[in-house]
């Protein structure tokens, strides 16, 4: 019974098989797969509406001929059937068909095609490796998703509304004019060839300019979003003018591309109106000549006139629509370049699922340099037994975060292997791997959602009691109860702002700790987990962390050595290699790099420039 609910005829969030193709036609097929049956019905209804436009002129011509031949009295008495048919046609059949066509496109197709395409692009983009996002503006990527889905939707809607309608109208007009005289139909055909030649000349140029305009628009969005995202940094460095210049430069480029597009579009419309204006002259003039020869009737003149004026009017509409279609196709191509690249970090088709509770971690002769051939880490071998607490220390750039990123399989190793629970991370799915790892980082990631949603991100199905218990363990419960956002939402319902901007650094880290506590993964990664906390709160969090770490395999990165002195083992990295390894007492006794770091600290923090001598 879905036909009684046209808005449900297309599954607006159905996934598409495989990656987005890199050819335009195949990309449209990929984007719209599953929607074609409904789109065809909408197109055929639009074609029926176009046919009815021609029939309207035909009915008008027949009424005029019949009225002139019969006279006033006989016309109403002898041709009542024609009058009733004309009334039903114009009052009932034509409006009803128009309504069905509008509903098919406006209710069944448009509202569903946009989310269908957008959801497919969004899913594909989320599967990209972190390098994809590292190399582009976040705002630009989002703009490309929105732009491409909107452009595909507009192309579909315009083809249904205009192209199907126009083709049916032209075919019907040719048939009707042929019935009057083949020479009139031939004149229409000749005009149509001239019109198509005009289209063929202008449309590719409009498409190229639209692509350039779309690219420039996305750069403006990326620049503006980048500035707004980092607005505190802009203000702290008093760089309003610098950011303004950068934005105006991007806007200036967009303006230039928009002007180029506008000039081409205006030229096209002038040429178009010239060609369109010639059609009524040719068709009406030709029919008048035939009428003078006794071949055409007065009704034929009226029908030809109505058809020619309608087609001339439709020409502007169709041409503007075709210009929009080509412009949208250009925007789709521009979006494809950004969004369609294949995933560089893929699960093996035969990848398995990492069993729950896999706490054993092994780095086996791992090398990784971010594709640069130097830097990163080299030949690192490190084993973490289940339940063991291991700290990584070293100067900035020593390779600590690289090891963590490789463990999470945000990148693939360039040499060696990483195993979790005895499984090579390349042989298990990325999702199952990351479900077994909890993480708290120095730069805590917060969503602009409620405090509840941010904590439940660790385990979405957790109960309210479990969520609150996690917040209490992270020393976050008390400050959350005092939260209130600008919409009046309070406590756990209060939204935290973009990237948690309404919270202090310490509050954000406590939310992140609560999230990790709730996740309760067998492996816990702490990347400067308490760096943004004051001493009193840090002491409280350290106690909570010790409880959370019980029974878990822990890999902790720290510059403040006092926070990791109690770890089972401390691994010192320098220049991407392990240079020392042991517990706190052993490393101090060795008098090496760790001892030198420790001696430089008073409550301890490793400087940016500290390194092995």
Predicted features and spans:
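ABC-type nucleotide-binding domain
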Residues: 354-613
């Amino acid at each position: 019974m879905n036909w009684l609910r046209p808005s449900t005829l297309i599954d607006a969030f159905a996934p598409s098989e495989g990656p987005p193709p890199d050819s335009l036609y195949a990309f449209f097929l990929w984007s719209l797969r599953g929607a074609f049956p409904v789109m065809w019905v909408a197109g055929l209804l639009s074609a029926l509406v176009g046919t009815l436009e021609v029939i309207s002129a035909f009915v008008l011509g027949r009424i005029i001929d019949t009225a002139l031949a019969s006279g006033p009295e006989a016309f109403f008495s002898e041709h009542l059937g024609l009058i009733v048919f004309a009334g039903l046609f114009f009052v009932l059949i034509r409006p009803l068909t128009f309504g069905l066509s509008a509903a098919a496109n406006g209710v069944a197709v448009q509202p569903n095609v946009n989310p269908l395409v957008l959801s497919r692009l969004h899913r594909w983009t989320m599967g990209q490796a972190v390098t994809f996002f590292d190399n582009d503006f976040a705002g630009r990527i989002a703009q490309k998703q929105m732009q491409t889905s909107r452009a595909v939707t507009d192309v579909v809607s315009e083809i249904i509304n205009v192209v199907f309608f126009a083709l049916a109208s032209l075919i019907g007009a040719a048939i009707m004019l042929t019935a009057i005289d083949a020479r009139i139909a031939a004149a229409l055909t000749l005009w149509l060839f001239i019109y198509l030649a005009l289209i063929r000349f202008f449309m590719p140029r409009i498409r190229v300019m639209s692509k350039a305009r779309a690219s420039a628009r996305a750069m403006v969005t990326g620049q503006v979003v980048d500035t707004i995202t980092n607005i505190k940094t802009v203000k702290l460095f008093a760089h309003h003018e610098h950011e303004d210049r950068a934005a105006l430069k991007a806007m200036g480029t967009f303006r230039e591309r928009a002007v180029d597009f506008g000039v081409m579009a205006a030229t096209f419309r002038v040429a178009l109106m010239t060609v369109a204006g010639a059609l009524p002259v040719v068709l009406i003039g030709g029919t008048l000549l035939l009428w003078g020869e006794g071949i055409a009737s007065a009704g034929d003149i009226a029908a030809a006139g109505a058809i020619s004026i309608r087609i001339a009017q439709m020409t502007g509409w169709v041409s503007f629509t075709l210009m929009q279609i080509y412009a949208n196709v250009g925007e789709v191509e521009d979006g494809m370049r950004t969004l369609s690249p294949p995933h560089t970090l893929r699960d093996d088709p035969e990848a398995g699922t990492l069993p729950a509770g896999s706490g054993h971690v092994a780095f086996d002769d791992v090398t990784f340099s971010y594709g640069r051939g130097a830097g990163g880490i080299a030949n690192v071998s490190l084993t973490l037994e289940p339940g063991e607490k291991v700290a990584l220390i070293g100067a900035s750039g020593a390779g600590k975060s690289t090891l963590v990123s490789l463990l999470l399989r945000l990148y693939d190793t360039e040499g060696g292997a990483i195993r979790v629970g005895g499984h090579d991370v390349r042989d298990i799915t990325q999702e199952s791997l990351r479900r077994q790892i909890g993480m708290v980082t120095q730069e805590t990631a917060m969503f602009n959602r409620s405090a509840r949603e941010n904590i439940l991100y660790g385990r979405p199905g957790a109960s309210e009691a479990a969520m609150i218990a996690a917040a209490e363990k992270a020393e976050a419960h008390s400050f959350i109860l005092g939260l209130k956002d600008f919409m009046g939402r309070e406590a756990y319902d209060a939204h935290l702002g973009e990237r948690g901007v309404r919270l202090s650094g310490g509050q954000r880290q406590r939310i992140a700790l609560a999230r990790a506590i709730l996740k309760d993964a067998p492996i816990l990664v702490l990347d400067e987990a308490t760096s943004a906390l004051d001493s009193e709160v840090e002491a409280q969090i350290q106690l909570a962390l010790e409880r959370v770490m019980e029974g878990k395999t822990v890999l902790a990165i720290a510059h403040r050595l006092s926070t990791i002195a109690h770890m089972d083992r401390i691994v010192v990295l320098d220049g991407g290699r392990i240079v020392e390894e042991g517990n706190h007492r052993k490393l101090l006794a060795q008098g090496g790099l760790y001892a030198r770091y420790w001696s430089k600290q008073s409550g301890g923090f490793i400087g940016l420039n500290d390194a092995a001598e």
